[in-house]
C-alpha cells in the first residue's frame, strides 16, 4: 500500500491487490473505513454479507465489523482506502483469517 495523505482523524491509502490475492478477514476497534474501487473488480465481505464491486463503486465498513477484500479476476485491483477515527494505528487490527499467516 501507499499512504497518499494523512490528517488528524483520517488517512488515505492506495492499495493494490494482485490477481488471486486477498486481504485478511479483519476488524478494527478504533476506525471505520471507506473503500473506492479505482480499477478492477473486488469481492468484498462485511460480516456475513458478500458483494462484488466494480470500478467507481464504494462501500463503507463501520468500526468493529469483520471485513475482507479479494481479487478473483486475472487483472490487478486498485482501491483507495479512507480511514476515519480518533486512533489511526496499523496495530488496530484483529485478524480472523489470513493467507499470509499473520494471525
In which residue ranges do the predicted regions lie?
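A short glycine-rich, His/Asp/Glu-containing loop-to-beta-strand
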Residues: 1-32
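Metal-cofactor-dependent catalytic cores
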Residues: 2-8, 47, 95-102
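A structural signal for the main folded, soluble domain(s) of proteins
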Residues: 4-7, 41, 68
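A generic "binding-loop/recognition-motif" signal
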Residues: 21, 30-31, 49, 65-66, ...
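Short glycine/proline-enriched turns and hinge-like loops at secondary-structure junctions
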Residues: 28-29, 54, 71-74
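Glycine- and acidic-residue-biased ligand/ion/polar-headgroup-sensing regions
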Residues: 30-48
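Short acidic-glycine-tyrosine-enriched beta hairpin
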Residues: 47-66
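Double-stranded beta-helix
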Residues: 68-103
Amino acid at each position: 500500500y501507499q499512504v497518499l495523505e494523512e490528517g488528524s482523524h483520517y488517512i488515505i491509502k492506495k492499495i493494490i491487490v494482485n490477481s488471486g490475492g486477498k486481504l485478511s478477514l479483519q476488524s478494527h476497534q478504533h476506525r471505520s473505513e471507506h473503500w473506492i474501487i479505482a480499477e478492477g473488480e473486488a469481492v468484498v465481505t462485511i460480516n456475513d454479507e458478500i458483494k462484488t464491486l466494480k470500478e467507481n463503486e464504494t462501500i463503507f465498513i463501520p468500526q468493529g465489523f469483520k471485513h475482507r477484500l479479494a481479487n478473483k479476476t486475472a487483472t490487478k485491483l486498485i482501491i483507495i482506502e479512507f480511514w476515519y477515527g480518533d486512533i489511526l494505528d496499523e496495530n488496530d487490527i484483529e485478524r480472523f483469517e489470513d493467507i499470509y499467516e499473520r494471525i
